[in-house]
Amino acid sequence: MLAGQALAFLGLTWGTFQSLAIPRITECGLSCSQGFACRSHRNRNIFNSFCRPRPVSMSRSVLEALTSSTAMQCVPSDGCAMLLRVRASITLHERLRGLEACAMSLDTQETQCQSVWVARASHRQQGGQQLQVHFGCFAVSVAQHLYVTLRTIPHFCGVQLDQRHLVEDCGEEDVGRSVPDCLAGKLSYWVDRRRKAILVQVPRASGSPDYYLRLCLKRFTCEDAGAPVRVTANSVSQAVFLPYSQELPCLCLEGWSATPDAVRIQICPFENDTEALEVLWDTVYYHPESQTLSWEPACPVSGHVSLCWRPGPGAGCRKLQQSSQLVHRRVQYPLVDTQPQLCLKFSTSWGSWVRCPFEQRRFPTWKMTIQPSPTKGHLRVTFFSSSPAHFQVHLCHRRKSQLPACQRTLQASPLPSASGDLAAAPAFAFLDLPREEACAPGICIQGWRTDVHFSVPQQLCNLRSSGCPSLRGRRRPRTRPRPPTAGWAWRALNRRLGGGNGETIRP
């Protein structure tokens, strides 16, 4: 008993394995159940697109079953062609004249239909009997998405069967080694960075159709990045040079056969190239008229972008509040301060990058200085700007690991330029601060521009050199007095004794 079950299981497994293989056929025509007379029409009857009321005597299940499968028809010199086989099972009815099967490509909306008519004597005399119909084959392509429908003739409302069918792709072993589209899709390429071109080698099977190659930018669709090149079947060389202007992660090589609804093969040579990724963050532009900073990536990018500022060289970039944006297409920041410390930070699935567009270019900028004020007991904060601007000052408590805690906000008073001509001399603004507050231990002064949406601060700390008194208890520098005898001999002897040249020595 166990042996019989094992044999039955093995037989079932082997039958299932064989059913996974794509059958090869030599002929594919119409056939009906024995005893029924059928004839076929390839042209679609447009009037069958409109339905009519179903007779009361006709059941909705008059269409019993619809099955679709893929087959291959092979010619030794030309390879194999992909075909779709459709089978239907119906119950005959006196009002039913025939069947219509259609296969529509979901990619191109192209539709193929076949009609099968049953002789009048058959549906009158054999009403209620089951009829099996094998339609003629539909020509399909590798990896094609199809929508298959079955209707009655005439088309009765609510009486229809449909299903989706996916044609096997080149990854299926039998298809990959037998179909010309798959053979031609095995492209070999070399990137010539010096000549900025991609050399493509197209392997050809005997009798295969012409082949197209192009470069495209893979966005929602693959957009042309150059004119397509046609490789003819009888061309002497199957090698093609495709020039490109810029290495980008979304720059792809696309190839397809010169046949309707052919499968397109895409290869993206720079997809994981570090240098190509760096190019994406360099398309930052500043528009002086509107003071707008914009960035538009050449390739689709998923992530966030924000403005940040660097307090000094090598420091981390601190994010500006309310500046984060999701990256969809183009990113814009209006009314941006053109300070060298202002940067853009890009955070994506590939990693993070920082670009400071004003760092190495000459843009309108401003500067803040602190010096003793003519008013007794005060320090004067002065702003110099190459264009009219408004500023404010913060008194901040300096911290070691965090941003300074800024409390007071003071507005600077603008002054016209000395000559009255802003183009000839910079504009000025100033603010006098009480010396006791500004010179307190751990206090920094931050200056901001207030007439723009996004600005970075300038910060000055340790203000003793700006008019604040020195700390009490600090020893004065000692100076070793220079001996009365001067000359190179005495200086050499003094150096050997460790005295130096009489310079100031800090404790």
Curated annotation (Swiss-Prot):
Q: Name one GO cellular component term.
A: extracellular region
List the molecular function annotations (GO) for this entry: interleukin-17 receptor activity
Under the heading InterPro entries, the entry gives: IL-17_rcpt-like, IL-17_rcpt_C/E_N
Task: Please give the chief subcellular localization of this protein.
Answer: secreted
Q: Which residues constitute the signal peptide according to the record? A: 1-21
Q: Can you say where in the cell this protein is located?
A: Secreted
- Which key words tag this protein in UniProt? Secreted, Signal
Which Pfam families would you find in this protein's record?
IL17_R_N (PF15037)
Name the UniProt record assigns to this protein: Interleukin-17 receptor E-like protein
Q: Which gene encodes it?
A: IL17REL
